[in-house]
Amino acid sequence: MVAKPRSRCCCCSVFIGVIILIAIIIAVIFTIRHRSNHSDDDGSNVKNYANALKIAMQFFDIQKSGKLENNEISWRGDSGLKDGSEASIDLSKGLYDAGDHMKFGFPMAFTATVLSWSILEYGDQMASLNLLDHAKDSLKWTTDFLINAHPSPNVLYIQVGDPVTDHKCWDRPETMTRKRTLTKIDTKTPGTEVAAETAAAMAAASLVFKESDTKYSSTLLKHAKQLFDFADNNRGSYSVNIPEVQSYYNSTGYGDELLWAASWLYHATEDQTYLDFVSENGEEFGNFGSPSWFSWDNKLPGTHILLSRLTFFKKGLSGSKGLQGFKETAEAVMCGLIPSSPTATSSRTDGGLIWVSEWNALQHPVSSAFLATLYSDYMLTSGVKELSCSDQSFKPSDLRKFARSQADYMLGKNPEKMSYLVGYGEKYPEFVHHRGASIPADATTGCKDGFKWLNSDEPNPNVAYGALVGGPFLNDTFIDARNNSMQNEPSTYNSALVVGLLSSLVTTSSSVESF
């Protein structure tokens, strides 16, 4: 009479055990699938991103001026060897800006700042692909120029060449013979934004070389401090004081560069003075609550992200009132990028690309994607699980998914089925607006007769590997024509942003907590 209930209990226990076992198995399968799906989203393209990164790095070599060392670009040679001679300084190094032979200090300094940031955040990823030394070499080639362009505390040479004269020619840099005039800023003709951006570049680069070359790092930091003081104590826009630059790299203001430079100097020195500057000038220059687009002209989004980094990792600053506006605006920038966010920007093509400007359209989606991966990695590394966007919450993986979508579009997942990174994939631009790439290396072509190569119907004889062209129109279309400089001209600052983005995507998400 007693055995039956016991038998029922045993059966029930076995039954419950089986149910639990099945539940565990289902949970394990779900977890594996979930991880697998995440891996498919974030990992299946890692090899593609790595290959693209290797290609992207080559464009810095293509753009080098000066006496080339260990040159692996067969169609490039020494050029610009006398640059700076009229001021008795050596400005032979540096990078040509785009498809021409100009050296514009403002975007070149931005290139150096972004490349430094990329190395600081993702140097380990670069090293795993044997690209770190290459990146540091490209950076030093640029900062060597910037150091020489700053011969005294309140003087900075910001341009080599006259763009009007330069654009009347279509020739190889190795064969140009025209006079290379210099443009400078000083206390009589200030240019706060250029001086401050160059200070940011020097400060960021000083961190890159802090361990490998302490003497060079110290030199960079000395110049950074001097340039920041020069910029702050002699405020004035270079676009106003030198109107000729307005047709090329016109600045919309210098407040963002001052905050950007002070932020980098704080990271490089931990001198409270620079953090105080940021806190005291944030209301005036920070444009709090108004998300904007990171570019060679607008450093605010980058500043917001860089300063929010301190709230993630710096003890005692997580609740800093002086950084609150920067952190909140950084969050607003991120919320605007996630497509399903209630505050998502509508500035996108039907193909899903962030689209802000017809000229150099890819700069903004690539820069936005780079910032998104940075912020995602800051969240993951610090254990912050959610980003609040109005009444909805998003995960770091949502930011990373957005970043991948922009990278994938750039690399060929777009309506044109074209890679906009030259040399990557089966289809990419063949008529890039780039003088050196368009003229055979053995051609004896001068200034004027070189235009036959601009107007040639034949693809470029030299492939400008790693060049990121301007990109598509709002309707996702692209015209691969050499005279289409709006869509088909590359630039060095685009390359710095691409290197940062791709470096962040070649491995699992993580971030160093301090530089």
Curated annotation (Swiss-Prot):
<dbReference type="GO" id="GO:0008810">
    <property type="term" value="F:cellulase activity"/>
</dbReference>
<keyword id="KW-0961">Cell wall biogenesis/degradation</keyword>
<feature type="glycosylation site" description="N-linked (GlcNAc...) asparagine">
    <location>
        <position position="483"/>
    </location>
</feature>
<keyword id="KW-0732">Signal</keyword>
<dbReference type="InterPro" id="IPR012341">
    <property type="entry name" value="6hp_glycosidase-like_sf"/>
</dbReference>
<dbReference type="InterPro" id="IPR001701">
    <property type="entry name" value="Glyco_hydro_9"/>
</dbReference>
<feature type="signal peptide">
    <location>
        <begin position="1"/>
        <end position="31"/>
    </location>
</feature>
<feature type="glycosylation site" description="N-linked (GlcNAc...) asparagine">
    <location>
        <position position="250"/>
    </location>
</feature>
<keyword id="KW-0119">Carbohydrate metabolism</keyword>
<feature type="glycosylation site" description="N-linked (GlcNAc...) asparagine">
    <location>
        <position position="475"/>
    </location>
</feature>
<keyword id="KW-0378">Hydrolase</keyword>
<keyword id="KW-0964">Secreted</keyword>
<feature type="active site">
    <location>
        <position position="489"/>
    </location>
</feature>
<dbReference type="InterPro" id="IPR008928">
    <property type="entry name" value="6-hairpin_glycosidase_sf"/>
</dbReference>
<protein>
    <recommendedName>
        <fullName>Endoglucanase 2</fullName>
        <ecNumber>3.2.1.4</ecNumber>
    </recommendedName>
</protein>
<keyword id="KW-0326">Glycosidase</keyword>
<keyword id="KW-0325">Glycoprotein</keyword>
<keyword id="KW-0624">Polysaccharide degradation</keyword>
<feature type="active site">
    <location>
        <position position="433"/>
    </location>
</feature>
<dbReference type="GO" id="GO:0071555">
    <property type="term" value="P:cell wall organization"/>
</dbReference>
<comment type="similarity">
    <text>Belongs to the glycosyl hydrolase 9 (cellulase E) family.</text>
</comment>
<dbReference type="GO" id="GO:0030245">
    <property type="term" value="P:cellulose catabolic process"/>
</dbReference>
<feature type="active site" description="Nucleophile">
    <location>
        <position position="100"/>
    </location>
</feature>
<dbReference type="Pfam" id="PF00759">
    <property type="entry name" value="Glyco_hydro_9"/>
</dbReference>
<feature type="glycosylation site" description="N-linked (GlcNAc...) asparagine">
    <location>
        <position position="37"/>
    </location>
</feature>
<keyword id="KW-0136">Cellulose degradation</keyword>
<feature type="active site">
    <location>
        <position position="480"/>
    </location>
</feature>
<dbReference type="GO" id="GO:0005576">
    <property type="term" value="C:extracellular region"/>
</dbReference>
<dbReference type="InterPro" id="IPR018221">
    <property type="entry name" value="Glyco_hydro_9_His_AS"/>
</dbReference>
